[in-house]
Amino acid sequence: MAVGTHRSEFAGALRAWRGRRRVSQLELALAAGTTQRHVSFIESDRSVPGREMVVRLAEALDAPLRERNSLLLAAGYAPAYEESDGTPTSGSTQ
């Protein structure tokens, strides 16, 4: 899968999760420790989020661990959580 496809997939997934949680870009940005502009750029594919930013956004959205893995995969990163118990996978920087 091309990198651009990952970006589009993540941008759509992030918008969908933000909509489910009914939070604004500003509210999400404040909770994730970034700016509203950065969230806007990520959602419109004008910025590529790093792995840590993807994790922070997923945590700020209180996404279930399985969905956090899905968001990481959508952004082109390896999953961070084991399927069995939600603990970080070995080698994770968490």
Residue ranges and their predicted role:
Residues 3, 30-31, 49-55, 59-94:
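Short amphipathic recognition helices of helix-turn-helix/homeodomain-type DNA-binding modules
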Residues 44:
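Short, conserved catalytic or interaction motifs in soluble domains
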Residues 12, 22-23, 49-52:
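Residue-level signal for the short linker/turn that defines the boundary of a DNA-recognition helix
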Residues 22-41:
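Short alpha-helical DNA-recognition segment
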Residues 1-21:
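A short, Lys/Arg-rich alpha-helix, primarily the initiator
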